């Protein structure tokens, strides 16, 4: 299949201009330090500029390593919610002739028509943006491969891009416009497509291209006028790999190229697998091609060429290979990493060769203390930054909840050496410095040469500054830790210190933590819920409560109907002011890009109530819908609220029964629903964010409502924070746009006068792809916590003595 595409680029200058603000005070933005928290899909280093490294992620965009600050710097925080799809990097390209030039191919999903190229002349401090004429898939299958985007070292204004469904593309004007290379033999338009483009820096016109199909390697020696399949490339699986062919068959007819590196001596190293990855891979191989002699050699690590010997018995199938790096100054120094041996044994391994793949050292095995039973891992004490700051959550509390990818090490005291280790780099400016990414973080060593002596390199975490979590829940109680959070994939945290990584919540450990709440008059009592694949014999693995502010947890005795080990989302939990009555609904809601309720299939009851920590659950009278729009009064015990389908519900008996009121008779718009947001210190005071209907407020438990915002206001989310000094009115924060009387951009706003006037909190440089959740702090005036869909968790504080005319400031990033 061949394509021809050309599109004029619409250039937009991003990141550097000051934003118009309405705020009286400037804000400082900081990351709540989790450190990592997501999948690192690629790490690249400039071939000539020392310490110039970039890390790309699937849903958190790209970071640049800043050596003087000893941290990674996010490059695309200017992206707003309308560009959430651009907060994922498909590929990174550096100009080998100019270290200041950087190119990012942005776009999370093929289903979106919003993909773009970001072009920088200052290492990502500012970008010019050009719309891409084809979709990208930074969070799709095959995101572990690459790099798809490459700069011609002989014509540095020329870029080539291997796409997922539009074939091989070429730009001669630095990504402004693109044309299809129509004579390329196979567009491989299978949704994975062409996964890497490599220029030979020693021979002008020679380009190597790989597609994720068997026999997918091609080359040209005349700048793309003519293409040939690389002769002799592996086309069929080695029969010796298929030890039990009737048990697990390869998913491809032959090896599929994953990544490739052209060494300085002309050797082309290629990793292979039977599936695009990062999951689902069962078989793989590593080969090297002598481009001068046109000879292929199988250099796959095996029992005959690897030291220490592979662990036996090894789980079958043995996985594939993806991660690959070659030392620029030594073409025989190679690192490869296996893919998808998890859950083992033996787990995925990093292999180091000093002789071009003739022999290998199993670095993962050497790095693991004796007696692990093939479950390679770092001692948990190594899960720390180079300055000693620990990242304790990487233990995953050794909780039996996931199984498979990302599961905690089965060996207590170890954290897995890694999974999805598809991003690996021998630092071009320091070959003893090796970095590799996982599904959660970046590990690094400065002593990889220890493996040559069959010793363990010293490892540390080099992910500081990278914050990639998806925030699913937040609370800020009146006492104890200022913030507790729930995240996608990594459970949740009690943030005793916002600026250093914290331990993960204890058992039961959830993969996601979707719901949190605290008791208004007993803030040390907290409930949480999330999916858990482990069946506990002594309680419900999907819900827990704490009576000490979130340090220790106890499982609920039973789950509500519809929540079990196979349910991915456990719904919403809330607890009354006394800390004795819990209401739990199996419905959920999503808030990005808009607030939308999702009701469960079995919708035969209202939210269930319990006063004995889940020993018994009662279906209520008066509310027969599993609505997610529920909350508890923070002051009056046994009082719960719900607003769903244009009906306002109130319970004063611990959720056993509800009185229902037609919204229009109370002063509310018809056919609406939202989470009731309650006052921290006044019974019956509630706010509702009703989208284009604005914000409504009541002080009498919902008997009478009043719209407090101007006509034209949009408010999708609302939260309550501490009152301004000298005021009795709590600060309100909304995600939306106040509209009239002053036209405003969509963002985060604060009101100190109950909605009469609004000040802008965020600005055009601090948008982070939009915010899934917002949470005010009842103890710190002006502070708001901001949960994102891939850029972690942030908090914004007013800068003392600085007006907004002086500008918002980025802060320290948490570490």
Swiss-Prot record:
One GO CC term on file: extracellular region
Enzyme class of the recorded protein, top EC level: hydrolase
Residues carrying sugar: 113, 180, 246, 290, 304, 387, 564, 603, 662, 754
Molecular function as annotated in GO: oligoxyloglucan reducing-end-specific cellobiohydrolase activity
Keyword RNA-binding part of the UniProt annotation: no
Reaction(s) this enzyme catalyzes, per UniProt: Hydrolysis of cellobiose from the reducing end of xyloglucans consisting of a beta-(1->4)-linked glucan carrying alpha-D-xylosyl groups on O-6 of the glucose residues. To be a substrate, the first residue must be unsubstituted, the second residue may bear a xylosyl group, whether further glycosylated or not, and the third residue, which becomes the new terminus by the action of the enzyme, is preferably xylosylated, but this xylose residue must not be further substituted
Protein name: Probable oligoxyloglucan-reducing end-specific xyloglucanase
Species of the source: Neosartorya fischeri (strain ATCC 1020 / DSM 3700 / CBS 544.65 / FGSC A1164 / JCM 1740 / NRRL 181 / WB 181) (Aspergillus fischerianus)
GN (gene name): xgcA
């Amino acid at each position: 299949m061949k394509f021809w595409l050309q599109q004029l680029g619409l250039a937009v200058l991003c990141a550097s201009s000051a934003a118009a603000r309405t705020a009286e005070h400037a804000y400082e933005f900081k990351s709540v330090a989790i450190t990592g928290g997501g999948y690192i899909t690629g790490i690249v280093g400039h071939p000539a500029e020392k310490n110039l490294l970039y890390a790309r992620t699937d849903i958190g965009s790209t970071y640049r390593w800043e050596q003087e600050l000893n941290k990674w710097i996010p490059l695309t925080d200017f992206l707003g919610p309308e560009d959430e799809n651009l907060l994922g990097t498909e590929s990174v390209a550096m100009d080998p002739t100019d270290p200041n030039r950087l190119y990012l191919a942005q776009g999370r999903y093929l289903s979106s028509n919003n993909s773009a190229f970001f072009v920088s002349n200052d290492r990502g401090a500012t970008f010019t943006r050009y719309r891409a004429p084809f979709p990208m898939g930074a969070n799709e299958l095959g995101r572990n491969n690459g790099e798809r985007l490459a700069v011609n070292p002989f014509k540095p204004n020329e870029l080539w891009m291997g796409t997922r469904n539009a074939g091989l593309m070429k730009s001669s004007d630095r990504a402004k416009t693109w044309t299809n290379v129509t004579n390329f033999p196979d567009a491989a338009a299978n949704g994975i497509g062409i996964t890497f483009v490599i220029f030979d820096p020693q021979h002008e016109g020679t380009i190597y291209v790989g597609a994720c199909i068997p026999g997918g390697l091609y080359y040209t020696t005349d700048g793309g006028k003519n293409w040939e399949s690389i002769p002799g490339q592996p086309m069929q699986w080695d029969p010796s790999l298929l030890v039990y062919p009737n048990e697990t068959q390869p998913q491809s007819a032959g090896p599929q190229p994953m990544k490739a590196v052209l060494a300085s001596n002309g050797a082309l190293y290629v990793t292979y697998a039977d599936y695009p990855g990062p999951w689902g891979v069962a078989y793989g191989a590593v080969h090297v091609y002598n481009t001068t002699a046109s000879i292929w050699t199988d250099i796959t690590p095996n029992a005959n060429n690897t030291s220490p010997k592979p662990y036996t018995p090894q789980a079958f199938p043995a996985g594939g290979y993806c991660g690959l790096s070659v030392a620029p100054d030594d073409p025989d120094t190679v690192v490869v990493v296996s893919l998808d041996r998890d859950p083992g044994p033996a787990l995925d391994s990093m292999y180091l060769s000093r002789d071009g793949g003739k022999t290998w050292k199993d670095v993962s095995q050497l790095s693991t203390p004796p007696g692990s039973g093939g479950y390679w891992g770092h001692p948990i004490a190594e899960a720390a930054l180079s300055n000693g700051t620990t990242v304790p959550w990487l233990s995953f509390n050794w909780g039996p909840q996931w199984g498979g990818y990302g599961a905690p090490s089965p060996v207590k005291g170890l954290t897995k050496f890694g999974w999805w280790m598809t991003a690996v780099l021998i630092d071009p400016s320091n070959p003893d410095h090796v970095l590799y990414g996982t599904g959660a973080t970046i590990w690094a060593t400065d002593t990889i040469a220890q493996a040559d002596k069959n010793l363990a390199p010293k490892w540390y975490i080099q992910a500081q500054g990278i914050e990639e979590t998806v925030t699913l829940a937040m609370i800020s109680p009146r006492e104890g830790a200022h913030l507790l959070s729930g995240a996608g994939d990594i459970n949740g945290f009690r943030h005793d210190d916002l600026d250093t990584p914290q331990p993960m919540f204890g058992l039961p450990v959830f993969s996601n933590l979707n719901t949190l709440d605290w008791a208004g008059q007993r803030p040390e009592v907290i409930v949480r819920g999330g999916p858990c694949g482990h069946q506990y014999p002594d309680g419900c693995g999907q819900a827990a409560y704490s009576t000490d502010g979130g340090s220790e947890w106890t499982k609920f005795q039973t789950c509500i109907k519809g929540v079990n080990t196979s349910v991915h989302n456990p719904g919403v939990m809330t607890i009354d002011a006394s800390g004795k009555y819990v209401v739990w609904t199996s419905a959920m809601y999503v808030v990005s890009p808009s607030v939308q309720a999702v009701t469960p299939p079995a919708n035969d009851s209202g939210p269930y109530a319990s006063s004995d920590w889940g020993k018994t659950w009662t279906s209520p009278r008066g509310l027969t819908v599993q609505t997610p729009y529920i909350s508890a009064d923070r002051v009056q015990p046994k009082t719960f609220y719900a607003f769903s389908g244009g009906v306002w519900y109130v319970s004063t008996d611990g959720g056993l029964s509800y009185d229902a009121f037609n919204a229009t008779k109370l002063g509310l718009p018809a056919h609406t629903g939202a989470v009731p947001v309650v006052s921290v210190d006044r019974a019956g005071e509630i706010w509702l964010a009703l989208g284009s209907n604005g914000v409504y407020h009541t002080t009498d438990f919902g008997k009478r409502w009043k719209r407090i915002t101007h006509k034209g206001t949009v408010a999708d989310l609302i939260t309550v924070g501490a009152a301004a000094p000298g005021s009795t009115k709590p600060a309100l924060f909304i995600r939306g746009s106040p509209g009239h009387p002053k036209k405003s951009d969509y963002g985060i706003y604060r009101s100190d006068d109950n909605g009469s006037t609004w000040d802008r909190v965020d600005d055009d440089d601090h948008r982070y792809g939009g915010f899934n959740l917002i949470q005010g702090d009842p103890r710190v005036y002006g502070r708001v916590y901001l949960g994102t869909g891939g850029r972690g968790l942030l908090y914004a504080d007013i800068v003392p003595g600085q007006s907004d005319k002086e500008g918002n400031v980025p802060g320290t990033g948490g570490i």
